[in-house]
Amino acid sequence: MAAAAAVIPPSGLDDGVSRARGEGAGEAVVERGPGAAYHMFVVMEDLVEKLKLLRYEEELLRKSNLKPPSRHYFALPTNPGEQFYMFCTLAAWLINKTGRAFEQPQEYDDPNATISNILSELRSFGRTADFPPSKLKSGYGEQVCYVLDCLAEEALKYIGFTWKRPSYPVEELEEETVPEDDAELTLSKVDEEFVEEETDNEENFIDLNVLKAQTYRLDTNESAKQEDILESTTDAAEWSLEVERVLPQLKVTIRTDNKDWRIHVDQMHQHKSGIESALKETKGFLDKLHNEISRTLEKIGSREKYINNQLEHLVQEYRGAQAQLSEARERYQQGNGGVTERTRLLSEVTEELEKVKQEMEEKGSSMTDGTPLVKIKQSLTKLKQETVQMDIRIGVVEHTLLQSKLKEKCNMTRDMHAAVTPESAIGFY
């Protein structure tokens, strides 16, 4: 049904839900029927229609950049996080549509506080919420559909929306075209159904005034033409031919209407008689099958007891073997743990041994290798050569020093003789 066409919601479904939830403080909870599990799909479809009436696509989805939910969005689990966010967003928007200020929840808000605020607003409208708040955390289920449906109804009441009765279109029957010679006059009965609160019966009234006027005109014409009718000028053969030609057109065929309740009643009686006749034949077979199944189940039960009694000692042995197996497994686990520890220690010792071997090999190779001795000999030879060169240089230096000292001594002696000779000459003169 389109969103613009407002119809009356089925009150029986709403009553069934309220009875199933146990509305009221002292009202006892009524046992739910087999179709109660699928009732939330109906509530979800009604909720989508109510949201369309509230223009949620233009005012909410486009502004918040959200995709429209499907007709069973909150009835089936798809993505709990996304469904819970969509539920909180719709609930906040519906509460704002009722004229009350409610802050739009964000993703980082506490979900428990958000649910508590929504339920408190729902209870302020006089609605009951006798289910745990954790049912709304999943974002889907009967409780989620119930809360959103109640808020949508309150929003419709606030904007002054009223439900109207549905208007059914009148179906026009197609007229059949038949040949002129073999034509039959077909009268189709069109029933116009008017929904009234006082009565459900339908009556057809005949306009007696019209019939009376037609009869009066016929009597007047007959009285005016009495003189012409006194003498007949019609040929009997032509009259018979005309009667044979017009007779097929005078046949009236009443077309059966599938909407007629009498046809459905007849069908119900036929089905009832068929079911009763079939039940008489099948009841014996079903009783026989039931008895055979009961006897078979009794035999199976007795056989199970006999087998259990016969195999009781084997079961005890099996249990003992299971206990021994568990003990052996525990011992194996303990031994396996010790082996693992010893394997680790062995790997550490092996690693240290490899290191010692490597060091010994390095030292042995260094001891047996003659390269260092050759280098030492070469160094000693070089040192000797350098020592000889130093000795030669020292001798040259000593010789040079000795020559310089001797030369200096000679010079001093000569100077001394030169100084003594003039003094003696002066004394001589």
Curated annotation (Swiss-Prot):
Example of a GO MF term: DNA binding
Q: Where in the cell is it found?
A: Cell projection, Cilium; Cytoplasm, Cytoskeleton, Cilium basal body; Golgi apparatus
Q: Is Transcription regulation a UniProt keyword of this protein?
A: yes
Q: Where is this region: pDED?
A: 335-426
Annotated GO CC locations: axoneme; centrosome; ciliary basal body; ciliary base; cilium; dendrite terminus; Golgi apparatus; intraciliary transport particle B
Kindly indicate whether the keyword Cytoplasm belongs to this entry. yes
Name a biological process GO annotation: negative regulation of keratinocyte proliferation
Quaternary state and interactors = Component of the IFT complex B, at least composed of IFT20, IFT22, IFT25, IFT27, IFT46, IFT52, TRAF3IP1/IFT54, IFT57, IFT74, IFT80, IFT81, and IFT88. Interacts with IFT20. Interacts with IFT88. Interacts with IFT80, IFT-81, IFT74, IFT172, IFT70B and KIF17. Interacts with BLOC1S2. Interacts with RYBP. Interacts with HOMER1; the interaction possibly prevents the pro-apoptotic effects of IFT57. Interacts with HIP1. In normal conditions, it poorly interacts with HIP1, HIP1 being strongly associated with HTT.
Record family assignment: Belongs to the IFT57 family.
What's the name of the protein?
Answer: Intraflagellar transport protein 57 homolog
Q: Which gene encodes it?
A: Ift57
